[in-house]
């Protein structure tokens, strides 16, 4: 709920390249995908083939979400390098699972490509 981790794992899809976008897909909130075996996540309009392609290569987590409103009007694809907070977890960033932080003087960069 509220975009936070709740400790439960499930399969949104297995051994497939397609997740149908239905009006109830986000009834339980966003979906955090891990261990994707693809470099790209796409939203494709099935009637026209028009698409938005997001390069997620190098990102260990990809969240997909939409407004909790029906019918489904949009979908957001968010490649992440860390995880959202836990439902009953610590509020401090440094205590969160997979939290990325830099020491003084360190730098880090990444690239996100969407077509």
Write out the residue ranges for each language-model feature.
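Short, structured beta-strand/loop micro-motifs enriched in basic residues and often containing a Trp
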Residues: 87-95
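Short beta-strand element of the conserved SAM-dependent methyltransferase core
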Residues: 30, 43, 77, 112-114
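Short proline/glycine-enriched turn/loop segments at secondary-structure junctions
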Residues: 65-67, 98-103
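Glycine-rich active-site loops that engage anionic ligands at enzyme catalytic sites
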Residues: 45-88
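Hydrophobic residues positioned within well-ordered beta-strands of beta-sheet architectures
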Residues: 39-41, 75, 108-110
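Active-site/ligand-binding surface loops and adjacent short beta/alpha elements
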Residues: 1-57
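Short Pro-Gly-centered flexible turn/kink motifs
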Residues: 100-115
């Amino acid at each position: 709920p509220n975009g936070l981790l709740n400790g439960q794992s499930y399969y949104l899809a297995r051994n497939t390249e397609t997740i149908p976008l239905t009006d109830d897909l986000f009834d339980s909130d966003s979906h955090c995908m891990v261990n994707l075996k693809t470099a790209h996540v796409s939203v494709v309009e099935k009637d026209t083939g028009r698409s938005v392609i997001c390069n997620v290569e190098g990102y260990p987590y990809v969240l997909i979400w939409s407004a909790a409103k029906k019918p489904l009007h949009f979908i957001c694809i968010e490649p992440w390098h860390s995880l959202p907070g836990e439902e009953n977890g610590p509020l401090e960033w440094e205590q969160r699972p997979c939290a990325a932080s830099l020491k003084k003087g360190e730098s880090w960069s990444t690239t996100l490509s969407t077509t």
